[in-house]
Amino acid sequence: MLRVNQIKLKYNHSDHELDRAVHKALRLAPNEICEYAIFKKSIDSRHKPDIYAVYSVDITDVYVADKNKHKDGSMSDGKISERISASEKSTLNNRQRKISEDIIIKRAKNKNIVKVKDIRYEFPVTKIQKDIKEEDRPVVIGFGPAGMFAALKLARAGLRPVVYERGQSIADRKKTVDIFWNGGILDTESNVQFGEGGAGTFSDGKLNTVIKDPTGRIREVLRTFVEYGADGSIMYINKPHIGTDVLAVIVKNMREEIIGLGGEVVFNSRLDDITVDNGKITNVVIKNTKTGSVITRPCKNVCLSIGHSARDTFYMLKDRGFNMQAKSFAVGMRLEHPQEFINYNAYMGAPYRLPAADYKVTYQTQSGRGVYSFCMCPGGYVVNASSENGMTAVNGMSYSGRDGKNANSAIIVTVTPDDFGEGVLAGVEYQRRLEKHAYREGQGNIPVQLVSDFKLNRVSTGFGKVVPQIKGKYTFGNMNNVLGVKLCEAIKEAMAGFDHKIKGFD
């Protein structure tokens, strides 16, 4: 397959202009028809207010065709296959000559045309299992992104997985979360962290990754999301996102598919113990978080998809002697700007409709700490994402339209064992300490503060131009009392640095 990179057009171009650009890049004759699909689309705003769309497209076929009118009245002049009816395409395939990739490359003389392989991810278990024994059914703990995809792949292989999720189904979970955001009591088993779809369901559904993908896993994930309800544009848009509102539909559809294939998804069911005999798993102990009843299920294979915040499960696994390794992380706060401000910085008043802009900023302090933006939510909301009593954590989310008044992003600082101490779970205890500080500073609500007051180490008394867009109760507090001197000084230094990239950022 051929891929044509760096096709650059004004952002408000027509489909016909893209067709023509592909035709020109390949140097096709007027009687040659090319079939292509968009592989990637990104925005080039380096020359704002002139904004460009930059494409990579995959060429599937190029044919020589008679210069006759098609049934729709158009001419055979290199337009993509979508312009040709299925019956007419079949006629062309049978009657006309396909042009080889080598000939196209040779005559195009275009360094942006390369040969690529269409890599498709293959699940290791390809043989459909029949009549699998009950004790051989794999058990999946957690129904966030990892658990959902594990269960789906296992179900498609005929292995009839059993999924235990400590939180609620998405419909019940949304009700529980809304009650909490409106001032109700936190449900420590079903909240923004726990429940069907995992934490990502209440975090916009950003699908960014910087890892290499030699086996095609990333596109397999994107294809799967589209199959269950996501917009097809996530297959090619740079920095794709789904939106919290659409994710709720997708996770339900995936669950129903798993059940339809013979799997089970059991909610309100927390892993409390794992029994191991001679180095082999023999049972899982599951507690119903609503009734308190406990079951012991015999099993041989367990997939732990427990996410970031199941801290009680981490400790249970450590007590049972499972090998664990600490992972570096970063901590910080959420920063809100008017989305119009971020848009203007990105597009400088471009005269056509553009997506809500995002940003990415990084900085290294004089002391060597890294400070950077993370999980940026255009047109989004800050949400109370707490999962333990007496602690406060926040996250960011956007709906599919990304049409909220404010943009928000985490501004976070790298931390090391010098900050939180040695021990495989020392970082977990450090997180808990910070969340307790936040809870105390906000008197049980989310503490908020103007950046100017944060710099001066004082509590704000009113809002300026930016009014918070927050899901959950909030009150004025001082973030210096939450993160401590070292981390706050790093953020303050970085904010001044960010202002050089985005004027007015701080």
Model-identified regions with their sequence ranges:
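N-terminal membrane-anchoring/stem segments of glycan-assembly enzymes
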Residues: 54-56
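Residues forming the flavin
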Residues: 2-50, 59-69, 73, 77-506
